[in-house]
């Protein structure tokens, strides 16, 4: 019986985002392609060709182009993906050929079979390149973090280093991009421009963890009309670096925010008139859950978005033309890979010629000098 292929939750999310961004302007049910894409992580070399051919066959069977205007719209979306194709010559040959077919309507209609074959090949080229790049980076990240050949102290240090490195990535790179603010440079004042990408990432990791960017982002989202009252995810993820106060202190305020109503100012009731018992219990449950996470009673690591349903990739923060949905996800995966490599180098044990001593601690061993 063949061994079951390892799956990656991270890659399942990333691959779906990649597929939907590439097929954004194409009328096709992408579920089959998404299921095929997920197979490319931890995929043996002998199986990759079959998976990629399955993606092409699905495109060939389902993609239809009605007119040259539709083709031009599709090409406008595909152009930005050229940066993630290993052989740019292949990309531009296919892309420019498709552009030529839009010269006249008669030429377009006559050559439609050739156009479809060319477009299907271009889409498969982009998808397979981006998915394989993403799979390689996700595999590196997961293997680095899940490696069993580490002492407990090294594993703890690396997990914490990576956690706060990712928090800084969100605070200094992703959130400023979403709200349209200038991205803060990770280097220190007076330094020469950084030529080493690893050094740039290292400085990003050294920037202060506590910033105002989360509150600034909430203000931005509130101006866009998005409900920002439920911020449990920020506490769990470590983005909102604040102590959670007692439930009783903030329950009326939270309920008032959700209801968008003034609190009745009398001694008999501290709740808005249009809040029922069910809503009060829901708010209480949410805050109780936050408190449990903050005290470590719940350690499942689950994080859900406070802004959307978070059921599918399409329920991300609903900002139109978001770069994250278009093509930059691979750049951020690469930054995460460099971060993981930097964390590994920082915490790798060096042979100091000492003696390993076993102790009755969860960390099990310490190194002592030879005496």
Swiss-Prot record:
Keywords: Host cytoplasm, Phosphoprotein, Virion. InterPro entries: Poxvirus_G7. It is found in: Host cytoplasm; Virion. Induction: Expressed in the late phase of the viral replicative cycle. GO terms for cellular component: host cell cytoplasm; virion component. Phosphorylated on serines by F10 kinase, phosphorylation state is regulated by H1 phosphatase. The record marks 187-188, 238-239 as: Cleavage. Late protein which is a part of a large complex required for early virion morphogenesis. This complex participates in the formation of virosomes and the incorporation of virosomal contents into nascent immature virions. Belongs to the chordopoxvirinae G7 family. Part of a complex composed of A30, G7, F10 kinase, A15, D2, D3, and J1. This is Assembly protein G7. The lineage of its organism: Viruses, Varidnaviria, Bamfordvirae, Nucleocytoviricota, Pokkesviricetes.
């Amino acid at each position: 019986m063949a061994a079951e292929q390892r799956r990656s939750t991270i890659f399942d999310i990333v691959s779906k985002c990649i597929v939907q961004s590439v097929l954004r302007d194409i009328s096709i049910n992408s579920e089959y392609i998404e299921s095929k894409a997920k197979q490319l992580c931890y995929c043996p070399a002998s199986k990759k060709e079959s998976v990629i051919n399955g993606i092409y066959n699905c495109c060939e069977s389902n993609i239809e182009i009605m007119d040259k205007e539709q083709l031009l719209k599709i090409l406008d979306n595909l152009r930005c993906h050229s940066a993630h194709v290993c052989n740019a010559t292949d990309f531009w040959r296919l892309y420019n050929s498709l552009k030529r077919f839009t010269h006249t309507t008669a030429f377009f209609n006559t050559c439609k079979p050739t156009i479809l074959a060319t477009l299907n090949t271009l889409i498969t080229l982009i998808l397979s390149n981006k998915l394989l790049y993403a799979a390689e980076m996700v595999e590196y990240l997961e293997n680095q973090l899940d490696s069993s050949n580490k002492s407990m102290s090294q594993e703890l240090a690396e997990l914490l280093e990576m956690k706060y490195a990712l928090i800084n990535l969100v605070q200094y790179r992703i959130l400023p991009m979403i709200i349209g603010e200038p991205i803060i440079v990770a280097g220190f004042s007076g330094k020469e421009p950084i030529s080493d990408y690893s050094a740039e990432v290292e400085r990003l990791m050294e920037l202060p963890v506590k910033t105002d960017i989360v509150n600034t982002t909430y203000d931005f989202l509130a101006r866009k009309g998005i409900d920002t009252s439920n911020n449990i995810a920020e506490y769990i993820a470590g983005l909102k670096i604040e102590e959670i106060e007692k439930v009783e202190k903030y329950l009326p305020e939270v309920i008032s925010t959700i209801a968008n109503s003034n609190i009745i100012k009398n001694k008999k009731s501290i709740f808005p008139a249009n809040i029922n018992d069910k809503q009060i219990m829901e708010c209480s449950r949410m805050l109780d859950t936050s408190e449990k996470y903050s005290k470590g009673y719940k350690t499942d690591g689950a994080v859900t978005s406070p802004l959307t349903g978070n059921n599918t990739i399409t329920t991300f923060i609903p900002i139109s033309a978001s770069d994250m949905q278009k093509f930059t996800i691979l750049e951020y995966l690469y930054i995460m890979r460099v971060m993981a490599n930097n964390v590994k180098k920082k915490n790798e044990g060096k042979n100091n010629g000492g003696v390993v001593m076993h102790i009755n601690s969860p960390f099990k061993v310490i190194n002592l000098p030879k005496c």
